Amino acid sequence: GIAAALFYLVHSTVTVTLLFLVVALVAAQRGEIGDVIQPAPALRDPVALGLLMLLAAASAIGIPPLPGFLGKLYLLEASLDRPGQGAVWLTLIAVGALTLIALARAGVTIFWHTHPKRITVWPAGDSRVLMQPVVALVVVVAAMTLWAEPLYRFTYAAAVQAADQTAYARVVLERVHFSAPWTRPYDGVLPQTEPPEVP
C-alpha cells in the first residue's frame, strides 16, 4: 500500500503543479477577470491552452493511460482483501467523479462562454514565459506514463526499505566511535560549562 501511495503522491504533485500553471496561463489571458470562473473575453491561445488543460484534467481525474489512472489502479489493487477496501474504492471513485464534473464545468465556462470583445493589452505581461515549465511538466507526465513500471518498482523498493524497522534502527542507533566529547553516551550528568571571560 505504501508503494502505491508513493506513486500516487508523485503523480498528484506533478499533475496539480501542471494544473496550477495552466490556470495561471489562462488567467493571464482573461483580462481583469483573471482566474474567476465566469464568461470573459476570448483567450489569445485557446487551442494550446485548451489542450494543456485537457491533459492536466485527464491526468488529475485518472483517465487511462495517464499516470493518474495508474496511481489509482495501484491503490485499488493494494486495498484488495484489506479492512476499509470499500471506503478506499468509494473515495477514489467519488473524487474522480467530482473532479470530472468541476473541471468540465470550468472548462466549458472558460473556453466556450466568451465575450466577443478581445483583449489587446495583457496586464500580466507575456504569459508565454510560463510555457517553459508547463512544457517541462508535460514531458514529466509523458515520462511517468511510458515508464510507470520502473517508477513503481522504485516506489516499491522505497516502501520496503521504509518498512524494514530493523535496518532503520541499526542505521539510526548505530554507535559512531569518535573521540569528540559531544558524541559520548549521555550518563545523566550535565556537563559543567564556564562562562567566557570578558576581556
Residue spans for each PLM region:
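Functional transmembrane alpha-helices
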Residues: 1-118
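Cytoplasmic/organellar membrane-interface segments at the starts of transmembrane helices
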Residues: 29-51, 105-199
